[in-house]
């Protein structure tokens, strides 16, 4: 039997998704599977899962998950996802909730307990299956306990002695930081409570443990891998990341172009391609009609923003510039949810500029596609952006982005006025810096239709495939001794 790469994640599209993590885990394991690598995914069984639609069925019952006070049990469900097994860890009181990590009151009080349970249950599932994976690939703080556990277990447990681990950081700002009293129930030995382990200013830090104990650490763009070793972007973990520089790699995310493909997109009223751009104009007209925006905006640029309404995504920079943008007679479309304060502000602006600005305080996949297709310019003023996927989608949909020049945005956008420009970037992440970059884009749209059309076509032809990323991840696995079939 071929060696197995097991992906552990709290989200996987189409089963669960709150952001880019779900997209990545819906694509990377499957891409490797199609390359001939034996892969599987383990993820929580959330209450909103559509079991009938995806053929999810119970495959293991009452798996014991050990704790200091005794075992509790988990059930495991399974689905066949294009020939690749996906396992779902089920325990109702932990995962049968409306949201994944928080509600409008804040983070769930038992998030540490929930995801410690998930990690330990995933390990118990492997024992029940009778196979230790060659590589366990963990993603973000929710699964970061697994590399720490396996580092210690494989020293005395022959079942795990050949398993190696990879820890991928999708967003360093979310670390899984909890009270020190919760450490005693996680299953790690006392020596893991140290500055070189999971201890972080007196707290229990799950992501720090994953970084400390994984055999390899990756993040989702080369620029972000460099940034997180600095105090500005390291979120307090720059020290341990610098110590682990030899094991740290930046691999740019890909895009699932089977889903984000304007030539063949079930969510669009009209398809189009670099050689058939008339369809994009029809998508714009349909978007204006759908959102109740003035038809006169067909003659003006429409700016689209899709993202969480939080400081990280720079929504406040957009809000601060709305009055100036309205003076330039542009349209603005906002899609996303986040802090109640920002939600209220964008809804107020929609009332103030009715017909010119539309804000939908939600996230729906179909509308996201139609905004990418119907907008002329895409806005992404992030204060930090590990990789970003929406700007990659915007490029493929021929909607040149205006984005801050950092992280994955720097790695994916060639800025104007370069001859091969695909968008616009800015270094001064402030309202003035953002507005200046927007006005560059608006001026080009207004005054040089030939240059704009050329940028649109170049953007659509840029390719960030998961195949490119998967080859780099496979190289990481092989550095750890993983030998794929046929080699």
UniProtKB/Swiss-Prot annotation:
Substrates-to-products reaction catalysed: [(1->4)-alpha-D-glucosyl](n) + ADP-alpha-D-glucose = [(1->4)-alpha-D-glucosyl](n+1) + ADP + H(+)
PANTHER family in the record: ALPHA AMYLASE DOMAIN-CONTAINING PROTEIN, GRANULE-BOUND STARCH SYNTHASE 1, CHLOROPLASTIC/AMYLOPLASTIC
Keyword DNA-binding attached: no
One BP annotation, GO: glycogen biosynthetic process
This enzyme's EC code(s): 2.4.1.21
InterPro entries, A to Z: Glyco_trans_1, GS/SS, Starch_synth_cat_dom
Job of this protein: Synthesizes alpha-1,4-glucan chains using ADP-glucose.
Family: Belongs to the glycosyltransferase 1 family. Bacterial/plant glycogen synthase subfamily.
Enzyme class: transferase
Gene responsible for this protein: glgA
Pathway named in the protein's UniProt entry: Glycan biosynthesis; glycogen biosynthesis
Protein name: Glycogen synthase
The entry's keywords: Glycogen biosynthesis, Glycosyltransferase, Transferase
GO molecular function terms listed in the Swiss-Prot or TrEMBL record: alpha-1,4-glucan glucosyltransferase (ADP-glucose donor) activity; alpha-1,4-glucan glucosyltransferase (UDP-glucose donor) activity
Superkingdom, taxonomy of origin: Bacteria
Organism for this UniProt entry: Oleidesulfovibrio alaskensis (strain ATCC BAA-1058 / DSM 17464 / G20) (Desulfovibrio alaskensis)
